[in-house]
Each structure stands twice: as C-alpha cells, then as structure tokens.
C-alpha cells in the first residue's frame, strides 16, 4: 500500500492543479452537455479530466485502481476486494460549471480499507485548494496563502449557519429542525466546496437531502476527520465506502463540531 507522507500528498496536489488547468481551458469555451442515465448533466470537461486523472494516477501508482464518477460501473464483485483505491470526481459541481458560477472543483481521494485517508479538493477559478491527510491535518490554500484548519466549536448564541445547494429546498431542511429554530442558509455550489466551508468554520453544517455519490463525500471525510468534524446519515451513522453494490449515498449532514449532540437538532423521520 502507498505510504502516507508529504511526498505523496504533493504528487496528488500537482495532479489536481494540472486537472484544474484543463477545467479552466474548457471553462473558457462553450462545452457540449449531455444527460446521464440518472438525468444529471455531464460535459466534455468531465470526461476529459476523468481520463486525464485516471491516466496520471495509474502511471504513478500502477497497482492502485481508480474509481471515477464518470467510470463507476465497475462491479462490486470486482471492487469489494480492493485494499486501497483512488476515488475521483473530475468535476464536482458540473451544473455550476455549466451555469458559470465558478463554484466547481476537482476532487481526488485515496481510500484505504474502506476509509478515506488523503484528499485534495481544488477549485481552479476560485484559486482555492483544501487538502488533508490522516494524522497530518487539514489545510486551505488561497492563492499563495496556506492556513492549517483547526477544531471548530458550534456557537448557539447566533443562528445555525447551514450550507445548502442552489436547488435544495430550504423548507425541506427546516422540516428536520425544531420548530422556529434560528438558522441562516448559505447557498454554495459543489458538495466538496461546502465541506471545505464546514471544515474551516465558515458554516456550522451542510445538509444534503438529495442524491450524491461516494466520490462527493469521501474527500470531506478526511477534511473533517482532521478538524474534529463528522458526517452522519439520517440514522446518525457514518457513511460507508465501497461496502455496498450501490455507490449512492443516503441523505447526510456534515458538521464542523462532532462533540455537540446533533441528535437534539436534527429530527429525521
């Protein structure tokens, strides 16, 4: 298995930056858009960067398989025995890319024994990169400024800050909160960028009551794990990785302060 160290992290960062440059080039022109079987959009940028990432990672780490959102039809029978693998989302926030909101990213995560252990989230237009590795910490790079992110404490002297997507029903989110619970919604693009905001304490949590894939959340597991945050499903159980036939996540909440009793806030049916 790969050794978790700064050299490995820097190799992955470089690949993420190279992928970001490709996304920038596609972003400057009109891209072809198609609908996938699940009715979500995919562009030529998704497909190109998926192939680029797969080739780069395979060339550097030939014994480590790659699972991409755009090539996720590998059978569970084949992948269930993987000891470690790369889980990638070449363009997290495809709809934001199409809508030209700048809020999209490339996401690379190393999963070992069903646990994400290294992650890089790079948003090229925002010049923002989040990266984390087990027992190393979580960092945010904005332009040339690098900051190590630390433990967050949820402050209930003010409204709860909840990150949601642009298409998320805020009333639906309110329905799982106590009646008249004070909160404010922060609308952000891709799932990975929302997880970065949770990790740095810009929001208290991110609620997702819609469909996502394991590639959308794996990176957040490392970011939040290193800053004492957490991700849980509607039963307050952790998400799983490569342990089921499906790669689709259940509904979930990401929180920046895992020490708080979130069961007293979120009231799932």
Swiss-Prot record:
It is an enzyme of class 3 (hydrolase). GO terms for molecular function: 3'(2'),5'-bisphosphate nucleotidase activity; magnesium ion binding. It is found in: Cell inner membrane. Pfam families: Inositol_P. Its cofactor is Mg(2+). Keywords: Cell inner membrane, Cell membrane, Hydrolase, Magnesium, Membrane, Metal-binding. The keyword Protein transport does not apply. It is a peripheral membrane protein. Substrate binds at residues 69, 91-94, 216. InterPro entries: CysQ (IPR006240), CysQ/Inositol_MonoPase (IPR050725), Inositol_monoP_metal-BS (IPR020583), Inositol_monophosphatase-like (IPR000760), Inositol_monophosphatase_CS (IPR020550). GO terms for cellular component: plasma membrane. It catalyses: adenosine 3',5'-bisphosphate + H2O = AMP + phosphate. Its EC number is 3.1.3.7. It comes from the Bacteria. PROSITE patterns: IMP_1 (PS00629), IMP_2 (PS00630). Belongs to the inositol monophosphatase superfamily. CysQ family. This is 3'(2'),5'-bisphosphate nucleotidase CysQ. It comes from Haemophilus influenzae (strain ATCC 51907 / DSM 11121 / KW20 / Rd). The lineage of its organism: Bacteria, Pseudomonadati, Pseudomonadota, Gammaproteobacteria, Pasteurellales.
